[in-house]
From Swiss-Prot:
HAMAP family: tRNA_methyltr_TrmY (MF_00587). It catalyses: pseudouridine(54) in tRNA + S-adenosyl-L-methionine = N(1)-methylpseudouridine(54) in tRNA + S-adenosyl-L-homocysteine + H(+). Signal peptide: none annotated. Its EC number is 2.1.1.257. Specifically catalyzes the N1-methylation of pseudouridine at position 54 (Psi54) in tRNAs. The gene is trmY. This is tRNA (pseudouridine(54)-N(1))-methyltransferase. Belongs to the methyltransferase superfamily. TrmY family. It is found in: Cytoplasm. S-adenosyl-L-methionine binds at L125, G146, C179. One of its GO terms (molecular function) is tRNA methyltransferase activity.
Length: 203
């Protein structure tokens, strides 16, 4: 199983703060949606071997973690608005529930999640990390990264203590959703998933 854990320290945890007509102005909830779709969708399909954990720590009810499981999720489309509707419904729901097929919400912070992931190969993405090609990460692993503002210093220290390796995608900083696409491409080549049908340029 391939997992992504993405930290959004200012993304809202209250559904009332997610404005569908202004996702960028809703604590950059547009980025949360893009990370979700890029982690789980490929051309004409859903990555059934992938899970994405969205750690939200913004107002008004932090922390909340929304987990979207590719094997179970239904009606996930590339547009941000539809994804935002699903995620906002998760924020409306009681903790420890599945308000939409394949979308779970619970009250968990970074330390809780890292404790649950103990024993898994864990890679932390940071600009000062070792080159991806040098580390050659396992396809079945957890990849942790921050949003455009990055982890807090405390989160950074915690991740470095838990990570099997700190990795970098190169000298140019990318958005979180772009990092996920780059990782997918690298890992898909290393071990093509069951749903792969050979080379394709269709996006």
């Amino acid at each position: 199983m391939r997992e992504f854990l993405v930290l959004f320290n200012h993304a809202p945890t209250s559904p009332d703060r997610v404005r569908l007509k202004d996702l960028p102005g809703s604590g950059r909830f547009d980025l949360v949606c893009r990370v979700t779709t890029q982690a789980l969708l490929y051309s004409h399909g859903v990555r059934t071997d992938t899970v994405v954990h969205l750690l939200l720590r913004g107002p008004d009810d932090p922390p909340k973690t929304i987990t979207v499981t590719g094997r179970r999720v239904r009606r996930l489309y590339p547009d941000e608005r539809t994804t935002a509707i699903h995620l906002r419904r998760a924020l409306e729901a009681d903790p420890d529930t599945e308000p939409h097929p394949g979308i779970f919400v619970r009250r968990a912070d970074l330390e809780d999640l890292l404790g649950e992931m103990k024993g898994a190969k864990l890679y932390y993405l940071s600009e000062d990390g070792r080159d991806l090609e040098e580390v050659e990460p396992e396809p079945d692993a957890v990849f942790v990264l921050g949003d455009h503002e990055g982890p807090t210093p405390e989160q950074d220290r915690l991740l470095r203590r838990h990570a099997d390796a700190v990795i970098s995608l190169g000298p140019i900083p990318y958005h979180a959703d772009q990092c996920i696409v780059i990782l997918h491409r690298y890992l898909d080549v290393k071990r093509p998933p069951e749903y792969a049908h050979g080379p394709s340029n269709v996006m």
